[in-house]
Amino acid sequence: MKEKIKEKILNLCNLCGKCVPVCPSYRVYKKESFSPRGRLFLLSHEIEHKSFEFCLFCERCERICPHHIGFPTFYLEKLKEKENPLLTFLNLNNFINLINLKKELPTKIMKEEGDIIVYYSCGLKYLYPSALERFEEILKKRGISIGVPKGLVCCGAIFLNLGLISNLKENALKNLEILEKTKGYLVIFCATCLWMFKKIYPQVFKDTKYEKGFIELSKRAISAYNYLSLKAEDELKILEEKKLRENILFHLPCHLTEDFNLVKNKIETRDFCCGSAKFFLWLKNFQKENKRLWVKNLENIEILATFCTGCYLNFNALLKKPPLILHWLELL
């Protein structure tokens, strides 16, 4: 590991332990080595440990830390130094088939240019396309057009979870090539995709010729909910009204926290970690263990609405109906 990274960890982490109780993997395993504090200690002493793979990249440790340092940021720097590891690849289709995929919106009906740009993510294509339909209907009434450029690919979060940084970079560069030719807000419907664009891309390409391009792109990225709060705030009142009439729980994904803080008073949410859609953790049965920590939130809940593709997949795989799993904006 680079000396400056080791030095930063040792200088900034004062071992206060605020990060320990908020870490999902620590809450399951109750071992210091599985806490952010323990991982940072091991990382700073160049000790490889199996607990590193149990990091969910949720960044709860960073948000609560007095110095705003967290294990994921430093772990990503370490992953950048490595070649892609030899991994046993899972058949992604087997995981996706745990839920009933909805039909992808026909791309021929979507214009490539508009007043704003929508990142056509995996979730929008296959899991909750009606969220985009509803979003477009609302903006159309206000004379705002959306553009969905062709050729956009997965944000690469799946590669980050597998430690495949070169594959992540490949997808990021494809998206940059297309999106830097566009203008206006880049509206994103998935919390993890938003996190990738706003934080991970700039960090992965730091000190490269692409850094500036990704920083500019990150400034344009905004959640679809936040954008509606700016342009159609009255429409969002429907969500709170429905919550009062029906047994709906609005789940706040880990990666939406910072963006959502800008508008958090407009809807009541529950903040808990789904356990990540990281495939390695499914192999270790982590998600089922972690479920015990959050399932108590769902008593008498008929609809569980989230804003993240990974959470959407996890909830569908772990829960029997009810509750029905939806995207927030499908309820508009």
Question: Predicted regions span which residues?
Answer:
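Local cysteine-cluster metal-coordination motifs and their immediate loop/turn environment
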Residues: 10-28, 53-70, 121-125, 151-162, ...
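Long terminal accessory regions outside catalytic cores
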Residues: 1-33, 39-45
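Basic- and aromatic-lined ligand-binding clefts that recognize polyanionic substrates
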Residues: 116-119, 125, 224, 228-266
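A short, acidic, amphipathic alpha-helical segment used as a generic capping/interface helix at domain edges
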Residues: 286-302
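Short active-site oxyanion
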Residues: 183-185, 300-303
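Iron-sulfur-cluster electron-transfer modules
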Residues: 10, 34-205
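Active-site anion-handling motifs in enzyme catalytic cores
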Residues: 177-178, 302-303, 316, 323-332
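Short, flexible loop segments at boundaries between secondary-structure elements
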Residues: 208-240, 269-276, 320-332
